[in-house]
Amino acid sequence: CVTYIYVGTPIERPGAQPQLQLGDRMVDVSQLSALVAAERSRMTPAEQQRHLVVIKADRHIPMSLLRQVKDALRRAHATRIIYTANDKKR
């Protein structure tokens, strides 16, 4: 089971604050822990062991935001994380 989180500024609003997208919806970092925990609760114990979170982030977002995301995932017991970064044209 894989959960995808996208972090970056919206394409249609360059210069705006970075936002989080969990699956197909926009979420606030304060909601992330509860949403991921709810997703994990629907999994079997075997699936929870294999659960992987992929964070795809804009290379230019603040590291403090990624730290908040990582802390939220830790609270949801989602500790298998892969980070990828992309260079958006500014």
Question: Residue spans of the language-model regions?
Answer:
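Long, low-hydrophobicity, acidic/polar, solvent-exposed interaction domains
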Residues: 1-90
